[in-house]
Amino acid sequence: MEQFRKRILRPSVALLMGTCSAGMALSGRPAMAQNRKPTAREVVAAIQEHVGIPWQKETVDTFKAGNPDTPVTGIAVTMMATMDVLERAAANGQNLVITHEPTFYNHLDRPDGMDESDAVWKEKRAFLENHGMVVWRFHDHWHRRKPDGILAGMVHAMGWEKYQQEENPYLFTMPERTLAVLAAEVAKKLGSPVVRVVGERGMKVTRIAFSPGSAGFVRETHALEMDNVEVLLVGETREWETVEYAADAVSEERRKALIVIGHVPSEQAGMEECARWLKMFVKDVPIEFVPTKQPFWTVADGGN
């Protein structure tokens, strides 16, 4: 179970973060000079101070765009800093974007095999520069926080607190329902029109494992093979790995099922929780949760 709990952390670029100035008016700090806004660097230092766990040297939680010493006029907290999110943030005067997932199409925000002259990538970088925006990623430490910030927000969004197991917060024991009913409930609560399911529609289920985001084949299959897991909910996964494994388990008449929610809806509420948390100690600038739009539409709904 411990292996199932852990997140994979990969090396990233060097940290570009300093210490918070003595004049910063964040919770627990002296009031700053009148009318002075905190810089992005100071906001991040306050996050490091309040997150409740040691800050790791090797992390993707770094600045991805902009000058960290930019005074912050507003903070947009989001699941993914898509072009749409950046445009909405800029229109609202939010020049610091705190994103959970990458901004530039790769875990380290260095898209392999893509030339810097690529039109889409270039326009996104230019937009950030032209609007004086700063992007900082908050992934590893938000997951490592106790409890995991993403998991806490998602469990609250689904209303599953009373079903959560104390010894492993990623496992849930709930009243019996069919797999089809469970999938429909998850889709409705998370606002995801693209939920996909592997398994028998009418199978009665009570024991659920939840793996938000993209945990990978090893952790996903280890979860599915557990005796106390009938259904695994994931954000996204490769179809020729975990999906095929789940399909084979069903063909072998094992009581197993897989629900694929979509990466964004599987973690979105966790970043809404992050915005609520930030407001507890960042008092100098407005903070808003800016939801990332679901990028997919289906033929069945006509794209509505």
Each language-model region and where it sits:
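Hydrophobic structural segments
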Residues: 2-6, 13-304
